[in-house]
Amino acid sequence: MDSDETGFEHSGLWVSVLAGLLLGACQAHPIPDSSPLLQFGGQVRQRYLYTDDAQQTEAHLEIREDGTVGGAADQSPESLLQLKALKPGVIQILGVKTSRFLCQRPDGALYGSLHFDPEACSFRELLLEDGYNVYQSEAHGLPLHLPGNKSPHRDPAPRGPARFLPLPGLPPALPEPPGILAPQPPDVGSSDPLSMVGPSQGRSPSYAS
């Protein structure tokens, strides 16, 4: 009788262990969000950063060959930028033509550098509901502004964060392959109007000049 009771207890113990294992295996786990709208590290985009904020100007941000940063009314090779995500919400901005990184000094002044400095050249990208973005220095927390027109007769007005509209950068047009000529109309006066025979083959002496 004692052996039967012992076997029953062991069976009950195994049933409890199996039930616990099955319960753990059947528990639901959250699925990671795979939305393409999230800013993953390594994501690269080519954009023009256009601003029409209250700066008395409408311009595209340019990173120039001499390292200066300014605005251009029209899109130009210097205003085509490469935005690369360093981590969620933080990007680096590179001039495609000049290979200079957009950087910001502690006083807010912008410049283009051939070398990437994580402290000076990393920007937080804040997405607004109207499609515009605001960029802030990750290290200093200063908003990204285009340099304004300096006037000796008035003090610069205080400015809020500048809004930039990222416009898609179109890839350069591919050149047409050489050697492709338009087809010529058939020569109805020839013995070979469709040019199926070489120039020196199958030609009647009657057509020789």
UniProtKB/Swiss-Prot annotation:
GO BP: cell-cell signaling; fibroblast growth factor receptor signaling pathway; neurogenesis; positive regulation of cell population proliferation; positive regulation of cold-induced thermogenesis; positive regulation of D-glucose import; positive regulation of ERK1 and ERK2 cascade; positive regulation of MAPK cascade
Coiled coil: none
TM helices/strands, residue ranges: none
Annotated keywords: Growth factor, Secreted, Signal
Region ranges (Disordered): 143-209
Annotated Pro residues bias: 168-186
GO cellular component terms, semicolon-separated: cytoplasm; extracellular region; extracellular space
Keyword Secreted: yes
SMART domains: FGF
InterPro entries membership: FGF15/19/21, Fibroblast_GF_fam, IL1/FGF
Range of residues in the leader sequence: 1-28
PROSITE patterns in the cross-refs: HBGF_FGF
Subcellular compartments: Secreted
Pfam name, any one: FGF
Disulfide pairings: none
Self-association state and partner proteins as the record states: Interacts (via C-terminus) with KLB; this interaction is direct. Interacts with FGFR4.
Protein function: Stimulates glucose uptake in differentiated adipocytes via the induction of glucose transporter SLC2A1/GLUT1 expression (but not SLC2A4/GLUT4 expression). Activity requires the presence of KLB. Regulates systemic glucose homeostasis and insulin sensitivity.
Family note: Belongs to the heparin-binding growth factors family.
Protein name: Fibroblast growth factor 21
